[in-house]
Amino acid sequence: MNKSIYALLCLLLLISFAAAAEKKEEEKKDYGSVIGIDLGTTYSCVGVFKKGKVEIIPNDQGNRITPSYVAFTETERLIGEAAKNQATLNPENTIFDIKRLIGRRFDDEEVQRDMKLLPYKIVSKNNKPYVVVKVKGEEKTYSPEEISAMILGRMKEIAEASLGKTVTHAVVTCPAYFNDAQRAATKDAGVIAGLEVLRVINEPTAAALAYGFDATGDKEKNILVYDLGGGTFDVSVLSIEDGVFEVRSTNGDTHLGGEDFDQRVMKHFLTVFQKKTGKDASKDKKSLQKLRRAAENAKRILSTSPQTQLEIENFFDGKDLIETLTRAKFEELNMDLFKKTLDPVKKVLEDAKFKKSQIHEVVLVGGSTRIPKIQQLLKDFFNGKEPNRGVHPDEAVAYGAAVQGGIFTNEEGTDTLVLLDIAPLTLGIETVGGVMTALIPRGTFVPTKKSQVFSTYQDNQDRVSIQIYEGERSMTKDNNLLGKFDLSGIPPAQRGVPQIEVTFEMDVNGILHVSAEDKASGSKESITITNDKERLSQADIDRMVKEAADAADEDKAAKERVEAKNTLENYIYQIKNTIGDKDKIGGKIESDDKETIETAISDALSWLDVNSSAEKEEFDEQYKILEKIVQPIFSKLYGAAGGSPNGAGEDMPNHDEL
């Protein structure tokens, strides 16, 4: 990509938002200081842009990252270090890893698996996971949004203590592969915390801002951001030039990170302990919490030392756990997970249409990228290229979020920055035959607004159902239903005549709004896809993309079959309407010819009734049979009138049907 393309993109953005900018100038709000928050699975971080640079704000313990822990005791609620420090004594009432629950369904396979390893109780409310704790002796349930809000509230307090003023606006990060429900839930958590979330920004994009903000020179650079944190994994390819950050592709796994590596270590030592003592500690919550902390600490030490020792006094049933863990053993326990992270790396390169050699920098983000084997695997994959460790792995995401906050407040040094992010999955509606008709293809820059005109499937149809789907397959049955609504009040008309404009609008946070309007009557309905809709689990997203690749030929054949059927059916009804119009051809056609056509139409409709599941070739053959009968008659009529010989329905609208 050269400078002229970047300049054109910037110009288009300026033109698109010029009117809105004028209006905003009149009613411009004073946001005050807009903070950037990295709401992490295991740790969170907050920063602010001021005086031309980003400041990462330490908490009251002097630490620049804060554990994403919330605990409830008999007398108080604890957040951060204080909550984590008492976790082994109060495991049932200490909440962590809440990011792995936010925006998910209770029956999600990954939620069910996590429940077996988490010491606190999780219950279902309308198929959403809620945590159950004892608060001052009474049992209470909290949604993941509420727990997340407590952590966000703590980060807000940390910022306010440093800035000496109230903070009301923030930019919050989330994994690039978070779906709509997870993004909406993250925004909701901000509202609960008393923050207006101006933007939900993708974590690898934020990290790229951190990397590129101080970069000198205007030469185009392609970077791959490899973001492996405590609970989630993202990888994105971006092109950076002249302050424009363009996301080219993104992929990841919202349920893969350092916590999974810890769990492998925990399972290993539970097995070792049972073999040596004959005692099973896997169901004891206090023992598990002790082991979880020891495993996390061992993992950290092994990033710089070849071995370490776990020492847990009175681990279970009066027995101590004292064992050695080598780096080699740690790598053996997790090698399949380490290698699993390379699959999304391959996918983003493929989606961006880049070769390995076209990536100028591989930027490491997230605490888990400190693991030497991870760094070695990436170096080998990129043919010996050393990964870039120039950004702070724990702080880069909050840094980028703070830069975005600075853009909102027009801070010095941010005026030339332009960020172009993308939609992670294709969005569309169902049309006749169960076809997925895409309005926003995967990889489209956001924010975006796309409209398309559709029509009715039956004569005098007074309402249509708009069903919204997300996924990569060509048939809706293989994709995920996000929501649906009906548009009624359509004036009676022949099929294919009404014009129904469907508009998809995705905002900068990746949240979707859909509307439909009948152009004749002005009747309009809309829906915002929000967190209360049943949404995808990460497994669903991964399955969709994989199945779409595996079943591309099958998808193509199914779509072609439906299109062939629709073409035949439309042709039949166009002919029927044409010969029935007495003011035009219907009034000029000879009775014998009309009878011939009516018989052919009747035969074709009867064949369709019996053979609705026929193959594409059979529908094509029926079309040719009908055309062979009808075409000579219409050609004769149009020839006599000096008109077009192409006959039936040449003035009929040609829209996909709902």
Curated annotation (Swiss-Prot):
Pfam families xrefs: HSP70 (PF00012)
Range of residues in the leader sequence: 1-20
GO molecular function, one term: ATP-dependent protein folding chaperone
Keywords, in A-Z order: ATP-binding, Chaperone, Endoplasmic reticulum, Glycoprotein, Nucleotide-binding, Signal
Glycosylation sites: N611
Chain span(s) of sequence motif Prevents secretion from ER: 655-658
Gene Ontology cellular-component annotations: cytoplasm; endoplasmic reticulum chaperone complex; endoplasmic reticulum lumen; lipid droplet; membrane; nucleus; phagocytic vesicle
GO biological process, one term: response to mercury ion
Location(s), subcellular: Endoplasmic reticulum lumen
Chief localisation class: endoplasmic reticulum
Annotated function: Probably plays a role in facilitating the assembly of multimeric protein complexes inside the ER.
Similarity comment: family membership: Belongs to the heat shock protein 70 family.
Family annotation (PANTHER family): HEAT SHOCK PROTEIN 70KDA (PTHR19375)
Protein name as catalogued: Luminal-binding protein 2
